[in-house]
């Protein structure tokens, strides 16, 4: 088992539903520690840079608009196999395909408004964490 860090974003739809605490509880029950957190309303430029990997995809504009539609809660999670564990907690990208009891099955409305983002690999996790947090903002 490897201790890892991963970036998690609770998206505007889930923030609006007031389920931040319920999602945090799931992280903690799964053995993930929240070692950094901030609430932020992303600017269009911030969202475009964060999701730049998708800039040529047809959904890019809609994704950016959704991510700037309201505040998001951004956190760094740490724990054994944190990346895989967080992705398991999140469930499938499309909430209709997500297993019962996952965050997306319970709180997401659509493939676009799908409640959460989580890093998909160690290199992207490190990059995404650096995008939102300086070393002095992470306590782990």
Curated annotation (Swiss-Prot):
Q: Give the source's domain of life in one word.
A: Bacteria
**Pfam families per the UniProt record, alphabetical:** NDK (PF00334)
According to its UniProt record, which residues of this chain constitute the active site? Answer: 117
Q: Looking at its record, which EC class is this enzyme?
A: transferase
* Keywords, sorted A to Z: ATP-binding, Cytoplasm, Kinase, Magnesium, Metal-binding, Nucleotide metabolism, Nucleotide-binding, Phosphoprotein, Transferase
Q: Does the keyword Magnesium apply?
A: yes
**The protein's assembly and partners:** Homotetramer.
Question: What name does UniProt use for this protein?
Answer: Nucleoside diphosphate kinase
- Gene field: ndk
